[in-house]
């Protein structure tokens, strides 16, 4: 099962840091999400796109998780040559994770 089957996501950026929030559609799936979607799983999934650590923050009242991806944007919007300088694609890519 892909993460996209039980959740949706949003992403944002600040400098060369990107964050990706994942929220379950049904609150009953939050516990499963929190158990399986670790910072290590996200880091491994993004591979070489994220050059720094990945930190996970739990948002239980909103049934979501926030992942902070350090050194993920090659210097940030004004410096990177990436096609996606704001890191918006991370929100779609994270949903491809197998649970």
Residue ranges and their predicted role:
Residues 1-99:
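Long, contiguous binding/interaction regions
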